[in-house]
UniProtKB/Swiss-Prot annotation:
Gene3D superfamilies tied to this protein: 2.60.120.230, Cellobiose dehydrogenase, cytochrome domain, Copper type II, ascorbate-dependent monooxygenase, N-terminal domain
Any GO CC annotation of this UniProt entry: secretory granule membrane
Protein name, UniProt field: DBH-like monooxygenase protein 2 homolog
KW Glycosyltransferase (keyword) present: no
Protein family (similarity comment): Belongs to the copper type II ascorbate-dependent monooxygenase family.
Keywords: Copper, Disulfide bond, Glycoprotein, Membrane, Metal-binding, Monooxygenase, Oxidoreductase, Signal, Transmembrane, Transmembrane helix
Cofactor(s) the record lists: Cu(2+)
Organism annotation: Danio rerio
Sequence positions that bind Cu cation B: 381, 383, 456
Pfam annotation, one family: Cu2_monoox_C
Signal peptide: 1-26
Gene name in the database record: moxd2
MF terms in GO: copper ion binding; dopamine beta-monooxygenase activity
Cysteine-cysteine disulfides: 209-256, 244-263, 358-472, 435-457
C-alpha cells in the first residue's frame, strides 16, 4: 500500500481505485481452513481463519443445540477474566453480545462491542454462529489473540433462556494463529490400553499401574492420534503410558512405585481437562515390526477426594494407528525437576520459584546414537500450588528462546500445548523448566511427591526423531543445600525447615539458595542407564509482554500512506 502509483490516472480511475481499496480492507475471509471439536462428544465444533494483513480473525461456532451458545478466550480455562460472546436464535430473531466474566456468574455485557456478528442460523437442532474480531485488542475487557496457544471455552443451553450451563461446558487449548492441521485417514483402526474394572481403595491419592503387552504387528505401524478413555472424570487426574525394556516379559498389576519401576520411557500422557492429541503429519509413535513387541505400563493417578471405596474404573488410552508411515518416529522426553520428597516448598509463599534443568550435552553418554530434538509440542505439569510454568531454551550459555510458556497455569485444565512450529533443540543445549507456586493458604511444607497435595515441576517434550530416552532432569544437590543452610545433617535440616518462621524474607532467601547451589543433572535412557553430573541454574528472562496495537491503527496508517502518495503524484 505504500508504493506510489505510476503514470497518469484519471479522477474516475482514482475513485474506483479507492473504492477497491476500501472493499479490500472490509472484505470478509470466506475460508475457514482450521477446525477443532472442542468437546469429546463432537457436539461443539469451532472453525476459524485469519488475515494478518487486515488484523482480523474469523470464527464459526457450530453446536448441536436449539438454545443459546457461547464461546470465549480464557486466561486459565475458567470463567474469571474470560472474553466471551453469547448468541442464539429465539422467536424474536437473532441475538448476539460481546461480554466478559468476573467470576462463575452471568458474564457482563461489554460497553464496547468488539465482536462483529456475520451470520447466525438455527436448523435441525444445530445453531451456527459466524463472527469476526480484531486479532489484537486494547479493550481491557477483551483478550488479544496471541501466537501462543490459548485456552478456548464454550458453553451452551437447551433453550434460549441464558442460564448456568451445568455440565454443558468445557475448555480446550488451541494455537489459533499457529495451528498444525490434523491428518484425515479413512478406515481408522485403533487399540485400547485401559484398566479393566479396577476397584478403587478409599485412598485420596492412589496410583495404579498395569503392565501389559500391546497388540502385535508384522510390520511397523505409526500411532498418529491418542484419545483418553475415561470412565470416571471426577476420579482420574492423569494417565501415563511407559514403554518397558525387553527385560520385562510378564504382565503385572499393582499399586505404582511399590517396587522398582523398570518401565520409564514415556510414550503417552494425558492430564485432567485435556482432550485427544494428534501428531503432526511428519511424525508418529512407532509400534510393531522392527520396533519390537514391547510390554507397556499404564499409570493412572486417581484423586479420590471423598475417599470412597469400591468404585470401579476402566480408564486408559486409545491409540489410532496406520500402516502409512510418516517421515519420522516421534518420542516423548520428561524434563524438569526430579520428583523427590526432600525438595520442599515453604508455606505462606505468594510466589515461589523452582527449577529443573535438562542438559542435552549428556544425552550421548547414555545413547550410542543421539540426535538433535525437533520439538513440536509440550505438556507442562504441576499440582495444586502451581500458577505458572515456563520452559527456557539456552545455547552456548545464552537464552535463545522460551520453548513453552503458561502464565496462567490451571491444575484442572492440563493439555498438550501445540507449539505451532517445530523448534530445534541441539545436542549441547540446556532446557530450564521454571515453575511458580502459591502456598499462601498452606501452613506446612509442601514436598515433592506423587500426591495431589505434593508438588511436581515437569515438562513433557514431544519431539522427533525418537531416541531411546526416558528422562532429562535435575535436583538441587542435597548435601550442598544442607551445608548452605548451616544444618549438620538431614534430620537437623528437616527440623529447621519445619520450625522456621516463614516470611517474605526467609522465603526469598531459601529460594535463592536452592537456585545458586550445585544441581545434580540426571539423564536416563529407556534401559535405565543413567548419566549423573553437576550443573548450575541459568537466569531466565522475563516473558516479553504482548504489544497492544489496534488493527484499525494499521488500517488507518495504510490509508494515510496511500493518500500522501496520491497527493504527491498530483502535485508533481
Amino acid at each position: 500500500m505504500g508504493t506510489c502509483l505510476k503514470g497518469n490516472m484519471s479522477v474516475l480511475s482514482l475513485v474506483l481505485f479507492l473504492l477497491s481499496v476500501q472493499q479490500f480492507w472490509a472484505q470478509e475471509d470466506p475460508l475457514l481452513p482450521f477446525s477443532e471439536h472442542l468437546d469429546l462428544e463432537h457436539n461443539v465444533q469451532l472453525k476459524w481463519g485469519f488475515d494478518k494483513i487486515q488484523g482480523t480473525i474469523l470464527f464459526q461456532l457450530s453446536v448441536n443445540t436449539s438454545g443459546w451458545i457461547s464461546f470465549g478466550l480464557s486466561p486459565n480455562g475458567g470463567m474469571t477474566g474470560a472474553d466471551i460472546v453469547i448468541g442464539g436464535v429465539d422467536n424474536k430473531g437473532t441475538y448476539f453480545t460481546d461480554r466478559h466474566a468476573l467470576g462463575n456468574s452471568m458474564p457482563v455485557v461489554d460497553q464496547k462491542q468488539n465482536y462483529k456478528l456475520l451470520s447466525l442460523s438455527e436448523s435441525d437442532g444445530k445453531t451456527v454462529m459466524k463472527f469476526q474480531r480484531s486479532i489484537e485488542s486494547c479493550d481491557e475487557n477483551d483478550l488479544p489473540v496471541t501466537i501462543l496457544p490459548m485456552k478456548l471455552i464454550y458453553a451452551y443451553g437447551e433453550t434460549d433462556d441464558i442460564s448456568y450451563h451445568k455440565a454443558q461446558r468445557g475448555t480446550k487449548e488451541v494455537n489459533l494463529l499457529k495451528y498444525m492441521p490434523r491428518a484425515s485417514l479413512s478406515n481408522a483402526t485403533y487399540f485400547d490400553i485401559t484398566m479393566e474394572n479396577f476397584m478403587l481403595p478409599a485412598n485420596q491419592t492412589y496410583y495404579h499401574c498395569k503392565t501389559a503387552r500391546a497388540p502385535t504387528f508384522d510390520s511397523k505401524q505409526h500411532i498418529y492420534r491418542i484419545e483418553p478413555v475415561i470412565t470416571n472424570y471426577d476420579l482420574v487426574h492423569h494417565l501415563l503410558l511407559y514403554r518397558c525394556p525387553p527385560t520385562v516379559t510378564e504382565p503385572l498389576e499393582l499399586e505404582c512405585y511399590t517396587k522398582t519401576e523398570r518401565c520409564m520411557e514415556t510414550i503417552a500422557v494425558w492430564g485432567v481437562g485435556g482432550g485427544d492429541f494428534e501428531f503432526p503429519e511428519v511424525a508418529g509413535l512407532p509400534i510393531g515390526g522392527n520396533v519390537g513387541d514391547f510390554f507397556y505400563r499404564l499409570e493412572v493417578h486417581y484423586n479420590n477426594v471423598n475417599k470412597t471405596a469400591g468404585r470401579v474404573d476402566s480408564s486408559g488410552l486409545r491409540f489410532y494407528y496406520t500402516s502409512k508411515l510418516r517421515q519420522h518416529d516421534a518420542g516423548i522426553l520428561m524434563t524438569g525437576l526430579a520428583v523427590i520428597p526432600s525438595y520442599a516448598i515453604p508455606p505462606k509463599a505468594k510466589s515461589f520459584l523452582t527449577y529443573g534443568m535438562c542438559d542435552t550435552t549428556y544425552i550421548p553418554k547414555v545413547l550410542e546414537t543421539a540426535n538433535d530434538l525437533q520439538v513440536f509440542s509440550v505438556m507442562m505439569h504441576t499440582h495444586l500450588a502451581g500458577r505458572k510454568v515456563r520452559v527456557g531454551h539456552f545455547r552456548e550459555g545464552k537464552q535463545i528462546d522460551l520453548l513453552a510458556v503458561d502464565e496462567n497455569y490451571n491444575f484442572e485444565f492440563q493439555q498438550v500445548t501445540n507449539l505451532g512450529k517445530t523448534k530445534t533443540v541441539k545436542l549441547g543445549d540446556k532446557l530450564l523448566v521454571e515453575c511458580t507456586y502459591n502456598t499462601e493458604n498452606r501452613n506446612t511444607l509442601t514436598q515433592g511427591g506423587l500426591s495431589t497435595s505434593d508438588e511436581m515441576c515437569l515438562a513433557f517434550l514431544f519431539y522427533y526423531p525418537a531416541m531411546n530416552l526416558s528422562g532429562c532432569e535435575s535436583l538441587p544437590h542435597f548435601s550442598s543445600l544442607v551445608s548452605e543452610m548451616g544444618a549438620g545433617d538431614t534430620g537437623t535440616w528437616l527440623y529447621m525447615m519445619n520450625t522456621m518462621a516463614w516470611n517474605d524474607s526467609s522465603i526469598n532467601e531459601y529460594q535463592q539458595t536452592l537456585k545458586k547451589i550445585n544441581q545434580t543433572v540426571i539423564v536416563v535412557n529407556s534401559f535405565n542407564k543413567a548419566s549423573i553430573t553437576n550443573g548450575t541454574i541459568p537466569d531466565l528472562k522475563v516473558s516479553p509482554p504482548e504489544p497492544c496495537v489496534r488493527a484499525c491503527a494499521t488500517k488507518n496508517l495504510a490509508f494515510m500512506s496511500l493518500f500522501l502518495c496520491l497527493a504527491g503524484m498530483w502535485a508533481s
